[in-house]
């Protein structure tokens, strides 16, 4: 990590609850690959059914669909979904290699890794 990049990239999974199997599988997929990138990545599970995750879920939904889309047309972020630095990357559980490629792409773009 070079001096200009002291912040880790943020990976967030929109997570409804433990009874949501796709949410569990998305969480497991991320937890399986992030140890490889641990010094560059921060992981957060946005549990939007809890008060602690509601605001972030709405914030990410507004970034996708705008205020009107969320509040007038009831459009929200897909569940489960995966965001990297606030950008939607996956709206379904990605294969391991695709998730690793996406993380590495963001790490390269942000100067954490060299482009090989």
Language model features: what each stretch is:
Residues 2-46:
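Local sequence-structure signature of Cys/Sec-based thiol-disulfide redox active-site neighborhoods
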Residues 18-21, 51, 89:
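Short acidic, S/G/P-rich loop/turn micro-motifs used as interaction or catalytic elements
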Residues 23-27, 57, 93-96:
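Conserved strand-to-helix beginnings and helix N-cap segments that scaffold or border functional pockets
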Residues 29-36, 52, 73-76:
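Cysteine-centric redox/oxidoreductase cores and disulfide-bonded domains
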Residues 39-60:
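Thiol-based oxidoreductase modules, predominantly thioredoxin-like and allied folds used
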Residues 59-76:
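Glycine-rich, highly charged phosphate/nucleotide-binding loops
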Residues 73, 77-115:
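Non-catalytic, surface beta->alpha helical segment in thiol-disulfide oxidoreductase systems
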């Amino acid at each position: 990590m070079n001096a200009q990049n002291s912040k880790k990239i943020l990976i967030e999974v929109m997570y409804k609850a433990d009874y949501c199997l796709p949410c569990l599988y998305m969480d497991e997929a991320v937890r399986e690959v992030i140890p490889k990138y641990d010094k560059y990545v921060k992981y957060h599970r946005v549990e939007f059914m809890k008060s602690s995750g509601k605001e972030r879920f709405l914030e990410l939904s507004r970034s996708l669909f705008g205020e009107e889309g969320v509040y007038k047309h009831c459009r929200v972020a897909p569940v489960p979904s995966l965001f990297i630095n606030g950008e939607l990357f996956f709206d379904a559980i990605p294969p391991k290699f695709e998730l690793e490629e996406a993380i590495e792409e963001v790490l390269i773009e942000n100067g954490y890794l060299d482009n090989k």
